[in-house]
Amino acid sequence: AAGVTFEQLNGFLTKTTTSKAHVNPVIFRVMPNTAIEVKSSMTFISAYNASQEQIDLLISIFNELGNAILIEERLMEAGTALASSGIAFALRYIRAAIEGGVELGFYPKQAQEIVVHTVKGAIDLLLENKSNPEAEIDKVTTPGGITIKGLNEMELSGFTSAVIRGLKASR
C-alpha cells in the first residue's frame, strides 16, 4: 500500500502472529508503474530485513518487466511521483504536443505518430549515448534558431517549474 512504512508493516505482522518466524519478517515495498503492462516499467524496490540474495532475486524479477532499482524507503513516495505519476505527466506532454501538431496542420493520427516517435527518439538518445538531456538539447539548438525560440517560449510559460511543481504535489 502506498505510504505504508516498514515500521507500520512490521508492527502489523508482529501483532497478528505468535509465530517466531515473523519476529523479524522480510518485507519489500515495490512500486512499478503502468508501463509494466508492456514490460517497460520503472520499478522501485525497498527492502527490510532482506538478504542481498533476496534483494538481487527480486530486482532480477522486476528487471524482466522493465527496469528496477533498490532505493531507500524514504524515497519511495518521491519515486512514486517521479515514475508512476511521471507516466501521466509524460503523456500529458505528448498529448499537448499532438494538439500542437494538429494546430500546425497535421491530422491527429499523423501528429501522434510524429510525437510518439520523436519522444522515443529522445529517450533512445539518452539511453544509447548515456548522456543527459541538456547535452542532447545542445545538439539541436542553434543560436537564433527555431529550437531555442520554442524552448524559451516554453520556459516563459513555466514549463520546467510546472513539471517540478506537479512532481512535488504528487508526493
Residue spans for each PLM region:
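NAD(P)-dependent Rossmann-like dehydrogenase/reductase catalytic/cofactor-binding core
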Residues: 116-171
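A short acidic, helix-capping loop that chelates divalent metal ions and anchors anionic groups
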Residues: 37-41, 78-80, 149
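ADP-ribose/adenylate-binding Rossmann-like module
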Residues: 1-5
